[in-house]
Every structure is written in structure tokens, then in C-alpha cells.
């Protein structure tokens, strides 16, 4: 057995337009005295996920003085999103908002959720670290966008965004949906439910009931706290613009969210059912959890005939045998199955499309090099291989002596540990074409994140 090529070299090489709903929210309901407005839960389906698509050729405004609502009362009741992306990410240890997460950054995922929830415009409150990402999104957005500098605290960032909205002269009844970009797993349905609640009652705060047993520690004593009626606040938090602006103008102290200031100002917040998935990215453990939620899977299969006069290459290993696999490239069925599994997980075209057998450039191509190109394409989408499991189906030759080398080759090119690659071999007990020694096949499943 010998290595056909250097996997390290290949590892180095691997280094529909969206349709958005019209701006509209539910009509305003009858309002009583602020103190009499009841707090309630408006249930909503949270199964939706932000859709993907191009944003090119759409209008964008990055000047905060531009009329985000067009300055017309004709859009009375429209909503504008505020996307907060000015945090320091000190506990995360890296820039959690711009780093790819399952192919898209947290800013992009939250931005898409606001758009999917039906906002008519978006104001980004940014830091110098996130400004460039916000500018890219704004440049291709299907709604007007503005970018403001974030403050030293979340409260200051929101205040800056509200001031930018005020300068656009929003119409009566306008709603603002304030969202932490770090809550990038929010579903558009939650955004829409919060906006609709704000249109009816003045506010719509995403929240989830406390499900765990709660204790308060005082000194060395633990006292149980009844969890009935307890909720964990999330975002988005949507409000009538006039009311939340009033609440911020009257703020006389710090608050960790907008609903707190809203309540201090004498308003009664309305809760909207959030989701356990809508957690904030704060620690590395939160990031790992989000990656698990966003893991994608693909499968691959390939088969080639055994013929005389060809080398038998499997998993980048040249295996001594009297026959080899027939194909336009080196016919490495194992790597071909792995490549198609990875491409499927990333929703990319298969190897027949990327490396057609009608192209002379791929005649006799080294499949290790092709795998490197596949990994590079996946990384260009902001993803990376996570796990690979493959099975070789062949009557002969014996594969066991070569399995470890195959795993090492695949791991090296994919940039993962050999412990994240499984390769097995099986026979068909003399049945079918594999069993009669006419061909060798392989199947694989892969995950990317």
C-alpha cells in the first residue's frame, strides 16, 4: 500500500431572489388607560427559519437623515427594525456577530429574520468591528436601511437608533422592533407576532415561561421561588415608536432591556410567546449549541466497474490489485461518494456538474485534489466539514489494511480530526455486481456546519 498523493497539499488547496411581504401590521385595537392594559401571551408558530436569497438590485439607504418611511402617513402602522450589533463579545473571545455560523453570520441571520417578519426598514447600531458587515447588508437590502454608531451600553445604542428614526419623521402609529443581533436563531414568525402585538396593544415582547425549578440564594440558605408567572425576556421587543421614545426620554437609570424602561414609564408590556431556540450568543457554549442546531447533512453514492489495466485508488490510497476502477478521473469511488455527501450538505451542485466527464481537464484527475476543491467551495459558503462516515462495498480486495490511511487522507484534506472520519468496508456475500467482482461502490454521509 502506498499513499497516492500528499493529503497536506490538497488540504492547503481547500484552505431566487427573496420576496418580502409588504409593510403591514395588524390594525390597532381599542386602547384603555395605560395602567389597565393587560399583560398577556399571544401564541405564535415558531417553526419558521429565515429564508436565503439574493439581495442585489434592491434599494438601500445608509444616510440616517433619509426618510425611512417616505415621510407619508400613507404607511401608517408600518414597522422599522432596530438591529443591535455593537456589543464587545468579551465573554465569547471572538467576534460572534460577523463570524460565519452555519454559512451566515449572526448579523445576517438576525437581519433576515427582521426582513421576514415584515419590517419596512432597518437601523443598524454598530461598532467599528461590525460596521462593514452592516454596510454590506444595507447595500443589498430590499428595504431602506440606516447605520448609526452604537453606544457604550445597549441602552445607549437603542437611544441612538431611536433618534435616527425620529429624524425620519415616522408616521403616527409606527412600530419599532428592537432586536439583539446575537439572538440570531429567532424565527421571522416571532418578529411578525411582536410587531402585530405592538400594533394592537402598544407593545409585543418575546418571552418564554421559566420551566426550571428556581431558587434564590441568600447567604447560605436556598429559598424556592414559585415559577408560575415567571418569564425570561428575549428579543425582538416591539413598541409603538412614540411610546418607546417617550420611555427612553424619561429613563432615569440603567436597564438591561427595553421592556423594563417601557414599564418604568407607566406602560404595560404585552408578552408574545418566544422560543427556546431564540437564545443569545454569549459564551462559547452558546456558540456550540447554535452550531448543533445548524448542522446540515448530505449523502453520496458512487460506483465504478473493475477493469484490467487500471490502478485501484480508494480514499487516495493506491491499493495493489489485479484490476482497477474505470472512470474519466482516477475513479476513486470512496472520495466521489464523500464529495457528493459534502456538496449535498452544503446544497451545492454534485461532482458530475462541477467536474464533468466531458471536460478533458478532468481526465485522470486526482480525486484528492477534487476533494480539496469541494472543501474550498464549502468554506466559501461560510461552512466547514464536521463529520464523515463512509462504507466501501466490494467483494475483493481486503480493505482492512488500508482503512486507516483512507481516513487520514480524508481528514487531512477536510481539515478535521481523523476521529471525525469513519470508513468501513463490507461485501455482498457474492450477490449482485459488487459480489461478483464486477464493480466497487461506496456510500457516504457527511455533516457540515
What is each model feature region?
Residues 434-449:
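C-terminal edge-of-domain segments
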Residues 71-131:
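N-terminal glycine-rich phosphate-binding loop and ensuing alpha1 helix
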Residues 389-398, 402-435:
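Short, conserved loop-to-beta-strand elements that form functional interface hotspots
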Residues 139-174:
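Short phosphate-binding loop-to-helix
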Residues 182, 190, 284-285, 292-404:
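RNase III-family endoribonuclease catalytic core
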Residues 175-179:
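Short aromatic-hydrophobic micro-motifs that form the base-stacking/packing surface
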Residues 185-272:
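Conserved core of the sugar-phosphate nucleotidyltransferase
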